Amino acid sequence: MATLISGVLETLRIVGDAALNPTLLVLALAFLTYGLPHLIVKFTGSEFIARWIDVFGLKTALKALVTLGIGLVGNQIQNLRASNNWSLFARGSWIWPEEIAVVTGGCNGIGKAIVLALVGKGVRVSVLDVADFPPELAQIGTVFYWKCDISSASAVAAIADSIRETIGHPSILINNAGMANRSSILDLTPEKASELIGVNLISLWYTVKAFLPNMILENKGHIVTMASMSSFISLPTAVDYSALKAGALAFHEGLACEIRHLYKAPGVLTTVAHPMWVDTNMTKGRQEAIERSSGNEMMKPEDVAQVVTDQIFSRRGAQLIIPPSVTWLSAVKGFPNWLQELIRDSIAKTL
């Protein structure tokens, strides 16, 4: 069901993009409105078609489509402004070799790919992780490592002080670290639940509390929250993950609002990313079933990292659905209940 809906909506999107292209529509309307009748006859080969254009209201239809197409472009512009603290233009002056980023969970998977993409632009990166520092990153002179349990407020605060003393104040914070747990609600232990909540959600408060104040002071910064498509749809045996990623989205939305209205720092940007299935340790052992169900190959960590870092380098905030073809899933909670359940049931069969 989910695959069918995705295919239909993607087809409609492609057709709609072409049919509602304002430039093409305006050119077509201009031709029909101002073109001489003999030119219409020349191109169509029929005087009947020239008369039919007026009789059957083709010009009126084109005018309606032009209006709709312009409206869609206006909607896209407003989305861009809203995600960028109501500015259409890139924010601030960023010199990448002078910028410092903090990446939680940066030793593997998406986090590691993000670190490599950042250093490719000259950004100095502080990695916070409980995993060991991988040799591939250790040999890069602009990557620094702190072993850190980000679910501990005191640990994050102490390491934030160390980062500031060692390399300076970070202007980029990427809250990437996450944990998955394949167990049902009844099988989840209180200890594991606390660990998952600490890493996937509560840590967002700790890292932002540590690094946001200087961003506000400078009116410059970018905070990226790595959520998931699970923010929009719950999965069996991953209810904890879905609930916490929904919480991460709520955190991002509230953070962006506080930055604008409480701290009056429009130069501090926020981005939230919602990747679909990615080939990482979290999906190990399920790749074949997921790809069979979705009809697509799973994304690689580098695919997600490219989208996220491109957004950072654009100096604009955003909500990123990765890949864009699954954007429709973000609207599932507005669907009729029966359709929501059919979609959840179809996804559940892959797990």
Label the predicted regions.
Residues 259-324:
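SDR active-site lid
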